[in-house]
A protein has these predicted regions:
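N-terminal glycine-/serine-/threonine-rich beta1-alpha1-beta2 phosphate-ribose binding loop
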Residues: 2-5, 12-169, 185, 189-197
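C-terminal helical cap and adjacent loop that interface with cofactors, partners, or active-site loops
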Residues: 14-19, 33-59, 87-88, 319, ...
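Predominantly a Rossmann-like dinucleotide-binding segment in NAD(P)-dependent oxidoreductases
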Residues: 83-84, 193-199, 204-314, 334, ...
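Aromatic/hydrophobic pocket-lining residues that form π-stacking "cages" and hydrophobic walls in ligand
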Residues: 160, 187, 213, 449-450
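ADP-ribose/adenylate-binding Rossmann-like module
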Residues: 168-180
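A short catalytic or substrate-binding loop motif that flags glycine-/basic-rich loops and adjacent residues
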Residues: 264, 313-318, 326-327, 341-342
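Active-site beta-strand termini and strand-to-loop segments that position acidic
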Residues: 322-328, 352
């Protein structure tokens, strides 16, 4: 067939439009009412349309971005939840300025194990609270506790943190600090009203590579920062079906939400690189999820626990990818996948006009290698081992250099020990912590924010400004020495 140029253009245009129409006809596009109204998930959970709204500060509340307390010679600690919390007990046992005065778990074997471990290291046995679901309330009522570590299943994080602060103690809460945006606001409001710290125990901010990249960013190696990538990619299929452990409760969230269920391990460090909450702020998020396949397939193939989970229906897509836009226009990609076979990765990437870093394995490219005395030919290649070693020697974080030897053998490559050392030392000296309740709320809010975006056809959803405007004047996180 002979088609003139003008006819060809019309033909291609018509074909393209027809293709678009066919594609759209096959898509599930949410209507306007669905996008703007409340969303009800299959389990009955309702996500309101105004979750991205910044709420006003109530009378009697004061900001806590620079909260300091009276210096103390010794910080008195209690730990609730002694599966994950055992690591915190052991970390505190290695700090001469910290004392674990009480431990708590519903399971007696875990309480005994934690008390034994501390007594063996320090020669003094902490009080034990165990056996019943609400025994922790007696612990937080004690008058001889400064800080309560909360390392329980997620549903207990917020009620325990609120009660802890109401009782005049600082709450150190495991990740994520909360699941819903409403609960994030409860943490913020209670911290401001009681003037007590509510810290998210994001240990990944204190890994060797994370501290290295933070120092590179603060020293200007990256130039002007513009993009970051992070994730929690971890094959947890066997863990999710393990009895007597986190599998007892963690799998439940795969039945309830379709979004990023565990954002903070990746997001916390890159938020600190970018100064989010301190000179920049989360603005909105767009999220997409793949189909749910992996967990169901694993369950059907393995029939864990003699097939007792056969009737369970999982809702969360295998891979969730969310993109966050900041107030300064920078972007962050956040991913979550715990149900497919893959090596572990948090991606941990940072990009700027002067350099790019990607982790797993650690790689760095710099725009002007000669500026740092490197052999590299330029930005089109990753630094070789010799150049990377040179950069680490120049820019290793002072906190890591100071504590590397003491942290060796600690949980998660030493980051658990440094996490406790840093924040308890800040309390001891009476200075502000590296992280505050606004970080805990913003990082944790991604769970419900991403779920609403997915449920409304990947529409943008605003992220609340939990600082209520303070981010505009707060200084970036400094380098801890």
């Amino acid at each position: 067939m002979n088609i003139s140029n003008s006819s060809r253009r019309e033909f291609l245009k018509a074909s393209a439009l027809a293709g678009v129409g066919a594609t759209l006809a096959g898509c599930s596009t949410p209507n306007e009412a669905h996008v703007k109204g409340a969303v009800t998930l299959p389990t009955g959970i309702v996500i309101q349309p105004d979750i991205g709204r910044t709420r006003p500060r109530h009378a009697g509340q004061k900001p806590v971005h620079d909260l300091t307390t009276t210096p103390q010679e010794k910080i008195r600690v209690a730990v609730i939840g002694l599966n994950r919390g055992l690591t915190h007990v052991e970390s505190c046992a290695g700090l001469d300025f910290a004392e674990v005065v009480a431990v708590c778990d519903i399971r007696e074997d875990r309480s005994k194990r934690a008390a034994d471990a501390y007594e063996k290291k320090r020669g003094k046995r902490p009080a034990i609270y165990q056996g019943t679901e609400h025994i922790w309330e007696q612990l937080v009522a004690r008058e001889d506790i400064d800080v309560v570590y909360i390392a329980t299943p997620w549903e207990w994080h917020v009620p325990m943190a609120l009660r802890t602060m109401e009782r005049g103690k600082h709450a150190f809460v495991e990740v994520s600090a909360a699941v819903t945006v409403d609960d994030c606001w409860k943490l913020v409001d209670t911290s401001e009203r009681t003037q007590k710290h509510c810290l998210i125990l994001e240990n990944c901010c204190y890994g060797e590579n994370e501290l290295f990249v933070l120092n590179l960013a603060r020293e200007g190696v990256f130039g002007e920062l513009n993009h970051a990538e992070c994730a929690y990619l971890h094959d947890l299929r066997d863990v999710l079906f393990s009895l007597g452990s986190e599998g007892d409760w963690r799998r439940e969230y795969h039945k309830q939400y379709d979004g990023n269920l565990y954002p903070t391990h990746g997001l916390g460090p890159v938020a600190q690189y970018l100064g989010l909450g301190r000179g920049d702020q989360f603005k909105y998020l767009v999220s997409v999820s793949s189909p749910e396949v992996g967990l169901t397939k694993y369950r059907n193939a393995k029939q864990p626990n003699k097939g007792k989970h056969a009737a369970e229906k999982y809702f969360c897509g295998d891979m969730n990818t969310s993109i966050v836009k900041s107030e300064l226009g920078r972007t962050i990609m956040i991913q979550h996948d715990v149900v497919n076979p893959r090596p572990y990765s948090r991606i941990n990437a940072l990009c700027g006009t002067g350099a790019t870093f990607f982790d797993y394995p650690a790689r760095l490219a710099v725009d002007e290698p000669k500026m740092f005395g490197l052999k590299s030919s330029g930005p089109h290649e990753w630094l070789d081992d010799a150049d990377m070693k040179m950069m680490r020697e120049k820019f290793s974080h002072p906190l890591w250099r100071k504590l590397e030897e003491k942290a060796a053998g600690g949980g998660h490559g030493g980051m658990d020990f440094i996490l406790s050392y840093r924040h308890l030392d800040c309390l001891r000296r009476g200075v502000s912590l590296d992280s505050n309740v606004y970080d805990a709320a913003a990082w944790s809010s991604i769970i419900e924010i991403s779920s609403r975006s997915v449920a409304t056809g990947s529409t943008p959803v605003n992220i609340p400004d939990f600082t209520r405007g303070l981010w505009k004047t707060m200084r970036p996180l400094g380098i801890a020495s």
